[in-house]
Amino acid sequence: MSEKNAYAKSGVDVEAGYEVVERIKKHVARTERAGVMGALGGFGGMFDLSKTGVREPVLVSGTDGVGTKLMLAIKYDKHDTIGQDCVAMCVNDIIAAGAEPLEPLYFLEPLYFLDYVATGKNNPVKFEEVVSGVAEGCVQAGAALIGGETAEMPGMYGEDDYDLAGFAVGVAEKSQLIDGSKVKEGDILLGLASSGIHSNGYSLVRRVFADYTGKELLPELEGKQLKDVLLEPTRIYVRAALPLIKEELVNGIGHITGGGFIENVPRMFADDLAAEIDEDKVPVLPIFKALEKYGDIKHEEMFEIFNMGVGLMLAVSPENVNRVKELLDEPVYEIGRIIKKADDSVVIK
């Protein structure tokens, strides 16, 4: 028995792997940008940092996946947008990265992205769809897709199962690092709308809608099928935020992901400050009203789990608010302000 046949009998289809590479080349080509070196398929992706024009470059990296939202993509057999979710989770984090309030919060331009797919059985058509979504996310973020890995792992995953993760690298001008100390009492909190649930809280989402087919037209969802709302891809905020940073209009940035308002907003500022949120001004999306109703979730807990309709929050000096609104070609929501901390870091009124 030949080695090739032996490997195939163990569940690994080498030819399918080659086919995936051929299928995704046209999608990868869409993401080309200055600085990319080498061709797809090498042992490592290469990028020429000198092409960025940054004088004192600081590299910032982030890695993430899409959590159990992936299980819904598998359940509904829809794979062409989950890749965008993966890119969004990485690049939105490296827009404003820093786990503690006074660590540097970086704003940067994404440079490149790499993806990793692991599966029980390599399906070239399916994984072309996945990578097409990754490429779309990279185009929206201005990042080049310079490499990746598709690992066929029979026995580790079921034949229809797969996992998806990504890794993003961006560059910032050292002099333009955003420090949390710039956020001050009296700053206005501006919210940019989310596209939906994004990619967090899906273990709860799946429990709430476990007995639904996905084709339901719930009255709260304004005529959209449930599955389409649940799989709405995560919004990428890079292009919206870049002009604001270039004009130095933003003191702090918060990516509202897992942990909702309560966990993510305090990462924008120092320990002696707090965010006062006017709940009536938060543009709560219909899906969150449906989740609260059908999941019997306490209202205050919703803000501890979900973005509630705001995916990116900006802390802006009052005198800069109008200019920020001019630059953003979209609705901007004044949802609160920065106050001196008394007890809680986030106060929702």
UniProtKB/Swiss-Prot annotation:
Gene Ontology cellular-component terms listed: cytosol
Disulfide bond sites: none
Domain of life: Bacteria
Gene Ontology annotations of biological process type: 'de novo' IMP biosynthetic process; adenine biosynthetic process
Any one GO MF annotation of this record: phosphoribosylamine-glycine ligase activity
Pathway field: Purine metabolism; IMP biosynthesis via de novo pathway; 5-amino-1-(5-phospho-D-ribosyl)imidazole from N(2)-formyl-N(1)-(5-phospho-D-ribosyl)glycinamide: step 2/2
Localisation per UniProt entry: Cytoplasm
Reactions mediated catalytically: 2-formamido-N(1)-(5-O-phospho-beta-D-ribosyl)acetamidine + ATP = 5-amino-1-(5-phospho-beta-D-ribosyl)imidazole + ADP + phosphate + H(+)
InterPro entries found in the cross-reference section: PurM-like_C_dom, PurM-like_C_sf, PurM-like_N, PurM-like_N_sf, PurM_cligase
Keywords tagged on the record: ATP-binding, Cytoplasm, Ligase, Nucleotide-binding, Purine biosynthesis
A Pfam family the protein falls into: AIRS_C
E.C. number(s) listed in UniProt: 6.3.3.1
Family the UniProt entry places it in: Belongs to the AIR synthase family.
Name of the molecule in the record: Phosphoribosylformylglycinamidine cyclo-ligase
Source lineage: Bacteria, Bacillati, Bacillota, Bacilli, Lactobacillales
